[in-house]
């Protein structure tokens, strides 16, 4: 009996280690998202998908934004190009080789804020060839490590298609409960013209000082970007690979709304009784899908207003890469 019990315990331990190894298997992910001109008359939801940024992995901000350390007083941005003098105030975020040590999970705390350009380029990549590290977090790869060149060239030749985002990264795959979504955003920032809910901005404080009720001045709050494409992509293992998309594509249009008034003076009751007129409006077009996929296969998520091409590839696991980054053989990580 004791021997059978010992065998059973050993089997359970082996299975648990096997499941853990499978759950932590690393894969390479490549994503291409494009907008297409459509004559679709489909009615889209009035409310955009809520963009969750409190628990996501952000691989894009450290590349396209200027990292600013939040301090009691205004500080200069921590540039992404190494400059010892310019970055002396934020040296704790820099490695000795000049590369940024900003954690892609840093937006899960209040340590790092970013200033962004008005338009984000479609091609997102690291400055050089990158590889994941054992027990590390997802890592952005260079554009040269991607494999979608011919696909992108073919789709770009189709009339009405416009590239929004192309990026490649490596990440460990975990169960759904342990997975953390990847933040995807791209295109134009509409925050200077529209609110997140789509309403046209009539009067805006921007970053100028404004007077409060007792006559003193306070700074207007920082305006969060309203990106043309924004949302998350979650990939996880549950015997098979699954992807979950929660993306908004924002497009300028027109909508019957109460006549616009001064944002500072309008009341809810007044806006409800005001006559409706055709008003500029920022539409929110959702791409929400949950799909089971197979590794190595190229999958296309179709939509009337956009398209998404994704491939999840098996790769040499980080421990093997660290020993020989030039290895040509691919280590098998399971029948996914």
Where are these regions (language model features)?
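Sec-dependent signal peptide recognition
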Residues: 2-8
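Aromatic-enriched hydrophobic runs in primary sequence
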Residues: 4, 27, 155, 169, ...
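Cleavable N-terminal signal peptides
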Residues: 10-11, 21
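N-terminal signal peptide c-region/cleavage motif recognized by signal peptidases
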Residues: 16-18
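Extended, low-hydrophobicity segments enriched in charged/polar residues
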Residues: 23-284
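Long, compositionally biased interface segments
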Residues: 275-336
């Amino acid at each position: 009996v004791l021997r059978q019990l010992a065998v059973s315990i050993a089997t359970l331990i082996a299975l648990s280690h096997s499941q853990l190894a499978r759950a932590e298997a690393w894969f390479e992910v490549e994503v291409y998202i494009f907008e297409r001109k459509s004559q679709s008359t489909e009615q889209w939801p009035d409310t955009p998908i809520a963009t969750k940024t409190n628990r996501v992995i952000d691989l894009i901000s450290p590349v396209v934004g200027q990292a600013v350390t939040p301090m009691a007083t205004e500080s200069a941005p921590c540039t992404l190009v190494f400059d010892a003098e310019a970055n002396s105030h934020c040296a704790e975020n820099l490695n000795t080789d000049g590369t940024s040590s900003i954690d892609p999970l840093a937006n899960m705390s209040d340590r790092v804020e970013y200033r962004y350009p008005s338009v984000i380029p479609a091609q997102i990549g690291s400055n050089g060839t990158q590889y994941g590290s054992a027990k590390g977090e997802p890592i952005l790869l260079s554009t040269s490590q991607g494999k979608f060149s011919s696909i992108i060239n073919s789709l770009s030749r189709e009339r009405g298609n416009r590239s929004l985002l192309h990026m490649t990264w490596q990440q460990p795959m975990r169960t759904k409960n342990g997975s953390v979504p990847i933040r995807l955003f791209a295109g134009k920032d509409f925050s200077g013209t529209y609110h997140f809910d789509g309403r046209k901005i009539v009067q805006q404080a921007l970053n100028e000082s404004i007077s409060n009720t007792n006559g003193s001045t306070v700074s207007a709050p920082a305006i969060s970007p309203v990106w043309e494409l924004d949302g998350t992509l979650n990939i996880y293992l549950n015997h098979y690979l699954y992807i979950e998309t929660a993306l908004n594509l924002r497009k300028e249009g027109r909508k019957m709304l109460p006549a616009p008034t001064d944002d500072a003076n309008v009341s809810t009751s007044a806006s409800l009784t005001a006559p409706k007129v055709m008003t500029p409006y920022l539409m929110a077009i959702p791409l929400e899908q949950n799909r089971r996929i197979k590794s190595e296969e190229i999958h296309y998520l179709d939509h009337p207003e956009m398209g998404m091409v994704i491939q999840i590839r098996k790769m040499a696991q980080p421990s093997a890469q660290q020993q020989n980054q030039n290895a040509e053989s691919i280590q098998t990580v399971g029948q996914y």
